[in-house]
């Protein structure tokens, strides 16, 4: 504990089974300034008996929040061999970078439209080694959102997702399709594009 809402921590896990062992070491910290700025970061690595060397990871974000503007940036990365044997990792072998911004407008006292906001979020995801090789991102996600808060407790939210997903060939290395003449490797498609809106209206409580 560094005082206030600031902290610094250490994580160490150890799992062994016979001659096999998995160890994870990480540092994490949290810093908040003036209730406006915040930085959170974690970095570490895993070491596993049947894998040469260590496998690094990181997860970090920086955010700012004011009455009219807020936003942030975040990044995470997990080496293909990173293995938290006593924990859970939703998806490894990936690097993600994201950024978001929100602009809030306030109506005059007694106005029908009390508050409105517009936000955008952009995220890119790479295969871990591809990121360091300078490859294009496999997945790109862009999310613009409009929100309107009206007098009396009515709320209108308009969310749109615009996404493109690349083909992760390593996921299908051993996946084959049966044909009339035998089996063929699954090839997939280069990219899948997805777009859609979601509109929600909340009535007064």
Where are these regions (language model features)?
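Surface-exposed extracellular loop regions of Gram-negative outer-membrane beta-barrel proteins
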Residues: 1-48, 110, 115-122, 200-205
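Exposed, low-structure sequence patches enriched in small/polar residues
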Residues: 42-205
